[in-house]
């Protein structure tokens, strides 16, 4: 019996080791080169045992995602278990601010938007707005003016079954300017290209929230619609014993992207029988799910007429022509349709976040189980190189000039994680600088189409500048005064010259 127990314990340990790959901690200076590009690890922010002091940052605690500001000046790292977002200078990589998510009912009441009817509390009744928030993903709106950061859950809601929340940061000051309710367990958030809508995807119960943000004034934003993907997942879990909400959460809605014309919203389904949910934004109605790609769809990106997917478990990047995908989506007869013709490229196991270089030629994929950053050439759909990342990478962003890639790594159990890796990329063929399209259109409303202008945008120009950008107004006034002085001086000299000639 003792021998059998020993054998069983040994087998259990072996299986555990096999399920969690060995931890990797590459040194700064690690590099990889191919004919198309070279990539080098140039900096880190880490907080694990044995960390080099020069790279240690105590605020890095299970970093979920990173977002580089569209102007390239700084980047934001969402520290999920730290209940904070850490802000770094893009040039020096020094920490410049920590945004903490600790709220109290009365103290922070003014930050909350007007509640909607979409998100009722069904389990908790007291001190609902006293909590700490666990930041997940984020997206910019209004040309980079605001950063939207959903919370995995409110800390008292141990099983993420009541409404969570989303914080909005003014990136000029890096202060919280608005809090809004969400559905349970929001993970992904996306802004439409025209800047009018923010979509919040609720992993926790198969729903997607739509927020109207067409105004420049955060006080005028409001919840517009709550959409259901097939069915609302019933939530009635324990209030004292925590369960695993990262699994068995219905369709586990994740990757979220608006089509370039903003007519449709696509949402990846990591769970259930998978696929991509399609929402018609003109009618704000759920159309059904497109199947046919590999299971376990994690992240979605649209670029140059293609829809790209990361396939988590199998470790693939897939793509298909967006027109072909939308044709299938529009012909859904019932709840699902199956689409064939996907192009595949195998990368590392556990493909999570993907982003594409400014030229559209390269896909960068954070591969969790492989502890690597993979690069795929979209012209051939083949891997061109890969490089080690601190275990286990999940989040990723690329700068608008393609020069820097930032990767965040969470742990698996008590292993790995607590790391942010910064890579510098040099391309054989120069990359263009990507145009800022983060909801920028809302800042340039069409003057010849009054129906598309919002009340808050139709204010007098000077009043609007004063309200939203006082520094710019002072510059305008100063320039005007200098011009006036110059004109007066010119006229006086001209008059004096005329008198002499006479």
Regions found by a protein language model. Name each.
Residues 476-493:
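A cross-kingdom C-terminal cell-surface attachment/processing module
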Residues 12-15:
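Sec/Tat signal peptide C-region and signal peptidase I cleavage site
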Residues 495-498:
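Membrane-proximal cytoplasmic juxtamembrane segment of single-pass cell-surface glycoproteins
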Residues 1-10:
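Bacterial N-terminal signal peptides
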Residues 17-471, 482-487, 500-502:
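Predominantly soluble domains enriched in secretory-pathway, periplasmic, or organellar proteins
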């Amino acid at each position: 019996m003792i021998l059998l127990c020993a054998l069983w314990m040994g087998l259990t340990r072996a299986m555990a080791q096999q399920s969690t790959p060995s931890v990797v901690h590459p040194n700064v200076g690690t590099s990889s080169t191919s004919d198309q590009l070279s990539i080098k690890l140039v900096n880190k922010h880490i907080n694990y045992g044995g960390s080099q002091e020069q790279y240690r940052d105590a605020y890095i605690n299970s970093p979920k995602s990173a977002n580089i500001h569209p102007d390239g000046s700084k980047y934001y790292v969402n520290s999920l278990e730290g209940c904070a977002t850490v802000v770094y200078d893009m040039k020096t990589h020094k920490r410049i601010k920590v945004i903490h998510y600790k709220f109290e009912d009365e103290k922070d009441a003014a930050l909350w938007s007007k509640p909607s009817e979409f998100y009722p509390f069904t389990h908790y009744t007291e001190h609902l707005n006293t909590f700490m928030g666990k930041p997940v993903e984020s997206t910019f709106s209004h040309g980079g003016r605001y950063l939207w950061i959903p919370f995995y859950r409110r800390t008292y809601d141990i099983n993420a079954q009541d409404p969570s929340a989303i914080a909005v940061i003014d990136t000029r000051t890096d202060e919280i300017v608005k809090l809004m309710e969400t559905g349970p367990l929001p993970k992904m958030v996306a802004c439409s290209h025209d800047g009018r809508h923010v979509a919040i995807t609720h992993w926790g119960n198969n729903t997607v929230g739509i927020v109207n943000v067409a105004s420049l004034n955060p006080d005028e934003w409001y919840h517009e619609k709550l959409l259901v993907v097939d069915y609302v997942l019933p939530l009635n879990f324990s209030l004292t014993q925590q369960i695993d909400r990262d699994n068995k959460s219905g369709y586990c809605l994740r990757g979220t992207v608006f089509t370039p014309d903003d007519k449709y919203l696509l949402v990846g389904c990591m769970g259930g029988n998978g696929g991509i949910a399609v929402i018609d934004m003109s009618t704000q109605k759920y159309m059904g799910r497109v199947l046919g790609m590999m299971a376990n769809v994690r992240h979605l990106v649209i670029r140059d007429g293609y829809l790209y997917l990361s396939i988590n478990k199998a470790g693939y990047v897939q793509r298909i022509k967006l027109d072909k995908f939308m044709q299938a989506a529009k012909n859904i007869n019932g709840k699902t349709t199956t689409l064939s013709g996907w192009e595949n490229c195998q990368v590392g196991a556990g493909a999570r976040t993907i982003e594409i270089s400014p030229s559209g030629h390269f896909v960068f994929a954070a591969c969790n189980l492989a502890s690597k950053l993979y690069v795929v050439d979209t012209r051939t759909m083949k891997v061109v190189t890969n490089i080690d990342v601190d275990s286990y990478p999940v989040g990723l962003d690329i700068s608008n000039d393609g020069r820097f890639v930032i990767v965040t790594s969470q742990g698996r159990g008590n292993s790995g994680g607590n790391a942010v890796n910064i890579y510098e990329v040099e391309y054989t063929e120069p990359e263009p600088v990507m145009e800022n399209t983060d909801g920028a259109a809302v800042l340039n409303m069409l003057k010849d189409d009054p129906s598309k202008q919002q009340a808050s945008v139709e204010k007098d120009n000077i009043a609007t500048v004063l309200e939203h950008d006082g520094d710019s107004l002072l510059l305008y006034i100063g320039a005007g005064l200098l011009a006036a002085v110059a004109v007066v001086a010119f006229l006086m000299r001209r008059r004096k010259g005329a008198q002499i000639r006479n």
